[in-house]
Curated annotation (Swiss-Prot):
Binds 2 Zn(2+) ions per subunit. It comes from Listeria innocua serovar 6a (strain ATCC BAA-680 / CLIP 11262). CDD domains: DHOase_IIa (cd01317). This is Dihydroorotase. Its cofactor is Zn(2+). Catalyzes the reversible cyclization of carbamoyl aspartate to dihydroorotate.
Length: 426
């Protein structure tokens, strides 16, 4: 049992109220002006925000098969440090969770080592990127969160349509990394100013938006919940907006780096600035911000993608795609958008908690009496510089190194257990 004393909580109007919070038996037992108990542990939250634990539906934990990049343990420790209490693990592992046996093995490993809640995706196709569909029913029984071939767009419309029909029959979501391979052209960055300046092959916007346009029509025909991963282009935002207006069951996420950065921020041919989708144009970034504010884009997800140093500290042509994000998402977004009065604090918290929960019907994301005690304590005055040497993640690959941010998680509770406390050893 914990009592969080003298903290602040956000009410429905977005105003801060001084409250104590009692955690008992893994639940939020009481939220009141003052709580006095004779047993349990007191946590001093004076002047700090007590918020629901963050939810990230797009995380690469790399285990099994990529433990040199990340493990379930290190990835969930990083999540806890970043304030995340629920993360959804992508299936680009070795082996791929494309069968009940592999999924059962993964679930056992999660139960054994995870510091926070991990909801694993199953793949759509066997081995990722094939045309053979997995056994959807068996994988749902084994606890799959949803189905995705993340990292690889499903290339054939017929394959995707059949997958959507099977997912719809089970009331499960299809989650899509949208990329038409015939339009990538071997690109490593956005097909724009930076690519031209550096003489690099570019990935055009249409590689993403064309597949989203195809898929929303398939989702309409199949009656499926279709979710777009890491949306990055103005055309994609337009397609999703039109689909929502047409009543199609489509949701979309955006990553912090696509909201904060664009291609003109890239300092040079540095593998730590290589991600997929790539940093796009200023016009694309503006469209993403507009889409998030008007509800076209539903929430924020990090696409945390750790790699070993030797896979990133090389030119872009040789580097792996992806950057880490779990430990820096909140401070970066708070600094860039809340402190600048572009967003309210409540908007940011909602996009990291209740919005993803609502999209995927998860019973998390709210701080209220009776709720699961997934909680992050945030020091909105704490200022610190992003230093990969301090990361709990094995991945140190971030373009934000050296940036000073304000507003950091200082404690995280997952199902009532203190899983991160600032200042304690890793």
């Amino acid at each position: 049992m914990y009592v969080l004393k003298n903290g602040q909580v956000l009410n429905e109007s977005g105003e801060l109220e001084n409250k104590d919070v009692l955690i008992q038996n893994g639940k939020v037992n009481l939220i009141a002006d003052s709580i006095e108990v004779t047993s349990g542990e007191e946590f001093d939250a004076t002047g700090k925000l007590i918020a629901p634990g963050f939810i990230d539906v797009h995380v690469h934990l790399r285990e099994p098969g990529g433990e040199h990049k990340e493990t379930i343990l290190t990835g969930t420790k990083a999540a806890a440090r970043g304030g995340y209490t629920t993360i959804c693990s992508m299936p680009n592992t070795k082996p791929v969770p494309d069968s009940k046996e592999v999924m059962n093995s993964l679930q056992a490993k999660i139960k054994e080592t995870a510091e926070v809640r991990v909801l694993p995706y199953a793949s759509i196709t066997t081995s990722l990127g094939t045309d053979e569909l997995v056994d959807f029913e068996a994988l749902k029984e084994a606890g799959a969160f949803a189905f995705t071939d993340d990292g690889v767009g499903v290339q054939l419309a017929g394959t995707m349509y059949e997958a959507m029909k099977r997912a719809a029959a089970l009331d499960m979501a299809i989650v899509a990394h949208c990329e038409d391979n015939s339009l990538i052209y071997g690109g490593v960055v956005h097909d724009g100013i930076f690519a031209e300046k550096e003489g690099l092959k570019g990935i055009p916007n249409i590689a993403e938006s064309v597949q989203i346009a195809r898929d929303v029509l398939l989702a309409e025909a199949a009656g499926c919940h279709y979710h777009v991963c890491h949306i990055s282009t103005k055309e994609s935002v337009r397609v999703v907006r039109d689909a929502k207006r047409a009543g199609i069951r489509v949701t979309a996420e955006v990553s912090p780096h696509h909201l904060i950065l664009d291609e003109e921020d890239i300092p040079g041919n540095d593998g730590n600035w290589k991600m997929n989708p790539p940093l796009r144009s200023k016009e694309d970034r503006a469209a993403l911000l507009e889409g998030l504010l008007d509800g076209t884009i539903d929430f924020i997800a990090t696409d945390h993608a750790p790699h070993a140093a030797e896979e990133k500290n090389v030119p872009m042509e040789q580097a792996a795609f992806g950057i880490v994000g779990l430990e820096t998402a909140f401070p970066l977004l708070y600094t860039h958008f809340v402190k600048t009065n572009e967003w309210t604090l409540k908007q940011l918290i909602d996009w990291m908690t209740v919005k993803p929960a609502e999209c995927f019907k998860l019973p998390y994301g709210k701080l209220e009496e009776g709720a699961v005690a997934d909680i992050v304590v945030l020091d909105l005055e704490k200022e610190a510089t992003i230093d990969p040497a301090t990361f709990y993640s094995k991945g140190k690959n971030t373009p934000f190194v050296g940036e000073t941010c304000i507003g950091w998680p200082v404690a995280t509770f997952a199902e009532g257990e203190l899983v991160y406390n600032e200042g304690e050893n890793k």
